[in-house]
């Protein structure tokens, strides 16, 4: 890496000649050996510390450091200085000149001691992974050798992140449980989630793995090439990987396949109407095989990270015949499932999101049959999820005003608008927002019930304590932007050099800093239900006013931060997953067991009502609607349908959710017998063959 930082501490100026002590002084090293003191070695060491802190010294600052160190050494009035004392002098000089480098120097100075502890922790974790496995990520199969190696590396990477990136205050906040830094094992290396611009990469051809790929000329080749792009690019990040509007991406390649097939049948002398019918059938077959290939590839071929990337595709707005065919066929393939004959089950990836436009998919509208195919698929497989483009709220406002679709990244993250000319704000009425090709750099979540408990225990104002942790997360995000900006485009060529990301036509040696201006950073929120319970003993079903007030306060602070820092911060309704159990343990350790707060084994996800609440789907939609526009950086509304494959009821509730502007998830209790293939909503034992081998 040939950065300005490196050039700075490789310059030829010898400060040892300019700044000398008043006598010969030796530095006594840890092994007892002695070396003549030379302040040039101090400059070399602190230069490296500055490089690790993403800064550099001016000539004047270096001279200040040299003068300080030489003066202190002279004051000692000894001929030999032990290395620990020399370290203290240098550290003190750095505190005077540039405190951020003092921390970097201090952290690195103690690395040997810390590495012993870190490697011991990694060893213990590796033994657990090797012989027991790991359940932290549902997208990894810890039985595989490649995954075990990845998990062990991740543990080391997590330790390095805590040691060399987080401040003492941040580490303490994480250990206590007031904040949670997501994906510590990967944040030093790369990005979080994205809306990858596959179409931009494909157009005109691209380079991958030092081999040139021509743009596909048929649909079947397009499926293969897109599959390779997705797996390669998704391996270079750690969050959800979304291919937005996949129906529109595939449409031109379907047209090419159709024209080729039609020409073939015409050469054979087939009647025009028969040739058209057969050509369409061929394209349909290519769609079926292509989507089936994706389902096998994305669910069985692990990435180089050792996991199965969280791949999402969005579709539904294409009005052309091949775009409609793409969406309907994708839904049919998902509904039928994969596996042995009579034992087929729906797969997980790619997650499908249906882009719902009332003017296209509503009753009697041109794409109503596409909507019907989606409902039928949801009733069988719980997917697609449904994103409203024409209801209320932020996503719909972008679509209605600009015709721009804000597809979700991964399971629920959404990008804030970034305008072509104005950036964070539109330059004028004609400025357009851009979403495709952008990404998120990471999320840090607040544990709100713990923050309230801390404020009460310490007799402090709740919002004062909350603002402290918001500021902590803010500073962490600022350093993350700066740190990632120093990375080179060669770390993810498809994204940074071949056009997968907005502005991604850099040279391999270029820094990626220019691409970060449109990237978001997330402030996550969890356990709003438990926050309300702790506040006044009432759940979100019974009250919720305080939870709304808190979320409004967070929104206000984040808006201020955005304007002051020029960064696209977003508020994210955290999908707590394993975190929901960890947070209960952290709360109990500090504040004990409190009814409705920490008496269960898990807290609620984001602003969701607790899963134990006895409420109807409509009540749940109405209750969670209060928080919808306060969590625009990430959210989803789930409803569990207690009805036996009643597609009309599901359709009614989806329509209602779309009117409300929701991103709606369909939850059903579905069970499959792995022995005979029987399926029904809920079963502990298969009623057909008596098997307990159920999925």
Predicted regions and their residues:
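A structural signal for well-ordered alpha-helices, especially hydrophobic packing surfaces
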Residues: 98, 116, 302, 477, ...
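Short, hydrophobic beta-strand segments
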Residues: 25, 68-75, 311-314, 530-533, ...
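Conserved catalytic cores of very large enzyme subunits
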Residues: 122-517, 538-540, 544-694
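Contiguous, well-ordered alpha-helical segments that form the cores/surfaces of helical PPI scaffolds
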Residues: 521-534, 552
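Charged, amphipathic alpha-helical regulatory modules used
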Residues: 2-129
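Structural motif
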Residues: 37, 81, 515-520, 694
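Amphipathic, well-packed alpha-helical segments that form the structural scaffold of globular domains
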Residues: 47, 70, 474, 478, ...
